């Protein structure tokens, strides 16, 4: 029997596969975020006319999902492998199935289903047509064609493939608990992450200073606005991410009511929309450098009319 892939070998296999499909291999973005979609490598690059093909691992923090390291399938922080391709290849689903084969999962021998699950992220004004991918009854991937990002219609269409690495690894390695996943030869997932899981859960649910978090949200929101006034898209978006994570900590702590929750989400969404519009304007001002010359000249001429 062949040796099962370790967690890091799964990552390496996916990186090599999507590299071969023309994706740039980006690194995880250094701000807390709830999903790989919120990385600027997806959120910003999915809008505007320029092509963009990228793949990266993104640690994703969801404070409300923390379970003190006691739940075998639910985590404060999990890892996503994010693929974003714009314009979307016509054979993106076939490429995805081929990537599973590279991981030793033969689609002809397993029950693989694309279950309709249209996606929406209210806090960033983003939505798209989507499917959950179920492997023998377990969700392992989210598949999305973005229709709107930051309140802006997307065009060309961007395809996003988000692998849940822990779920995928637990299936491949045939373990019931995420903490039993072999990260590398002789090193278990739990030996690396179970203590951080406990500590972050304790902090999120019991220890975090609610007043400080409320003040920080206001400060981060204000600073994002100041950066936008200067046309500084990327620093502004960093503060949008900080607002989002701070809100998630407040939400986990039970510090916001249902009414207040909607208000905080709207504040984040309003900032994200301004960031998106400013980014598109910035790329136009720069002359859409990632476009081929013929398309670039044509588009700039149309914009000038």
From Swiss-Prot:
Its main location: cytoplasm. Transmembrane segments: none annotated. Pfam families: tRNA-synt_2e. Belongs to the class-II aminoacyl-tRNA synthetase family. This is Glycine--tRNA ligase alpha subunit. Keywords: Aminoacyl-tRNA synthetase, ATP-binding, Cytoplasm, Ligase, Nucleotide-binding, Protein biosynthesis. Its EC number is 6.1.1.14. NCBIfam families: glyQ, PRK09348.1.
């Amino acid at each position: 029997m062949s040796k099962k892939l370790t967690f890091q070998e799964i990552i390496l296999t996916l990186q090599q596969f999507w590299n071969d499909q023309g994706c740039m291999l980006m690194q995880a973005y250094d701000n807390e975020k709830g999903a790989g979609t919120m990385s600027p490598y997806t959120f910003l690059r999915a809008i505007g006319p320029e092509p963009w093909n990228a793949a990266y691992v993104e640690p994703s923090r969801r404070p409300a999902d923390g379970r003190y390291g006691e739940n075998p399938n639910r985590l404060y922080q999990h890892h996503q492998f994010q693929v974003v391709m714009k314009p979307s290849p016509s054979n993106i689903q076939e490429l995805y199935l081929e990537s599973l084969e590279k991981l030793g999962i033969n689609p002809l021998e397993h029950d693989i289903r694309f279950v309709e699950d249209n996606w929406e992220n209210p806090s960033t004004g983003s939505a798209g047509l989507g499917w959950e991918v179920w492997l023998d009854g377990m969700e392992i991937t989210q598949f999305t064609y973005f229709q709107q990002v930051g309140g802006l219609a997307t065009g060309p269409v961007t395809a996003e493939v988000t692998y849940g690495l822990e779920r995928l690894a637990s299936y491949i390695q045939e373990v019931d608990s995420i903490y039993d996943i072999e990260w590398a030869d002789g090193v278990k997932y739990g030996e690396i992450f179970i203590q951080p899981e406990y500590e972050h859960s304790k902090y999120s649910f019991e220890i975090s200073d609610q007043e400080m978090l409320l003040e920080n949200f206001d400060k981060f929101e204000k600073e994002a606005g100041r950066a936008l006034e200067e046309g500084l898209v990327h620093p502004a978006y960093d503060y949008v991410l900080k607002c989002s994570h701070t809100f998630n900590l407040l939400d986990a702590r039970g510090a916001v009511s249902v009414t207040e929750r909607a208000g905080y989400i709207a504040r984040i969404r309003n900032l994200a929309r301004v960031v998106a519009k400013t980014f598109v304007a910035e790329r136009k001002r720069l002359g859409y450098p990632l476009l081929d010359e013929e398309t670039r000249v044509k588009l700039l001429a149309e914009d000038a009319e």
